[in-house]
């Protein structure tokens, strides 16, 4: 038995049961840790190769402003698709439940006695009712949030917005030599491997097949903590009129923004995550970035695109560890994609994420104002 296999076999039964319940892939794990140990995976291996250019002005499609005739046309197109049963929503409600004092973010109260998840689901449900349709809604959980979010989902389901959960997978953090990280108590450190799990987890759960059988053709993805990314029929209309497999909302960058951005790689327009840009590339040459709100044709999630695993550094109790993640936006490297430029703030604002309690306190007034304007509060 190899040392690696021996390490896994030595895990306690409770940990092994949790890993198995949430789809831990032992073979992939062993391959990745071997690649890390042998130097085949790591920081410099994450960098893109080939020609890399900022997007041109013509690469971005601007969402028309509210009250314009063009926006109204897109809204009608989106509502027609909702009414026809073609649209479902997926809200990312996973993660590690560490930034709000151990409380699952979806269950944190934001405004008017309502939580992040309440407000997300109320928005989707109201949009479904206005369109005269039904929007099946999925919540992607993690091992850390699944129990709590599933309880909330069961209580929140309605005929116009039935709610169901499925979970992303789980893995173990490593040290640079590929060995399993353990803290001072000797405990291993589990993590959820990012939103890149979406295509695989939604298929593995059977939820994607259920959507297809129900006649759904497009899936609207957003983060539970970005309440400005409301379920807007005009965005759906823009996706349909763009006639691309994927639509990604992008917004103007502000100081401190981190994440992916639109770029052309060997001529192909796609989203590139920040850590994938070579150090020689000036990321400030790209004025927009990915807001993590996307629309997919179901075929995009059914495709067999091979998404890469990336070694990402994290700090756990002061120790530097490695975890492997996939990126859902890497699908844009394989499939035709529309970059939809949306407003960040103001009446049309669509990007107000909340990562921790301090950010919630500072952003709450602006979030409440926006939600009132959109009649969600």
Q: What function would you assign to each model-found segment?
A:
Residues 314-315, 331-377:
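Long, compositionally biased intrinsically disordered regions
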Residues 19, 23, 136, 315, ...:
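Generic amphipathic alpha-helical segments used as scaffolds and interaction surfaces in large
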Residues 4-8, 22-30, 75-103:
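N-terminal nucleotide-binding beta1-loop-alpha1 segment
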Residues 1-57:
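A short N-terminal interaction module
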Residues 63-89, 101-329, 333:
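Domain-scale recognition of functional cores that engage charged ligands
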Residues 26, 39, 43, 131, ...:
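Short secondary-structure junctions and interdomain/linker hinges
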């Amino acid at each position: 038995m190899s040392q690696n296999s021996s390490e896994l076999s030595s895990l306690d039964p409770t940990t092994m049961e949790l890993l198995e319940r949430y789809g831990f892939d032992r073979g992939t794990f062993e391959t990745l840790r071997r690649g890390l140990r042998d130097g085949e995976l790591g920081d410099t291996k994450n960098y893109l190769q080939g020609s890399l250019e900022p997007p041109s002005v013509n690469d971005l499609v601007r969402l028309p402003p509210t009250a314009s005739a063009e926006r109204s046309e897109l809204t009608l197109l989106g509502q027609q698709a909702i009414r026809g049963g073609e649209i479902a929503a997926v809200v990312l409600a996973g993660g590690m439940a560490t930034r709000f004092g151990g409380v699952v973010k979806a269950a944190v109260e934001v405004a008017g006695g309502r939580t992040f998840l309440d407000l997300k689901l109320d928005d989707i449900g109201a949009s479904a009712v206005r369109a005269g349709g039904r929007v099946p809604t999925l919540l992607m959980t993690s091992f850390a949030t699944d129990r709590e979010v599933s309880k909330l989902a069961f209580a929140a389901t309605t005929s116009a917005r039935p709610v169901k959960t499925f979970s992303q997978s789980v893995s173990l953090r490593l040290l640079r030599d590929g060995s399993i990280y353990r803290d001072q108590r000797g405990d291993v450190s589990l993590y959820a491997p990012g939103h890149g799990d979406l295509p695989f987890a939604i298929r593995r759960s059977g939820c994607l097949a259920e959507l297809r059988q129900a006649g759904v053709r497009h899936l609207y993805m957003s983060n539970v903590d970005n309440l400005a990314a409301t379920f807007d029929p005009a965005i759906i209309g823009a996706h349909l009129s763009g006639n691309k497999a994927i639509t990604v909302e992008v917004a103007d960058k502000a100081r401190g923004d981190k994440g992916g951005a639109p770029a052309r790689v060997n001529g192909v327009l796609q989203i590139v995550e920040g850590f994938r840009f070579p150090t020689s590339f000036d990321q400030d040459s790209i004025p927009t970035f990915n807001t993590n709100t996307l629309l997919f044709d179901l075929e995009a999630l059914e495709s067999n695109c091979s998404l890469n695993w990336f070694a990402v550094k994290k700090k756990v109790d002061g120790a530097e560890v490695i975890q492997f993640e996939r990126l859902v936006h890497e699908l844009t490297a394989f499939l035709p994609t529309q970059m939809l430029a949306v407003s960040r703030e103001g009446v049309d604002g669509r990007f107000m994420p909340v990562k921790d309690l301090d950010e919630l306190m500072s952003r709450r007034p602006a979030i409440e104002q926006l939600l009132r304007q959109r009649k969600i509060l």
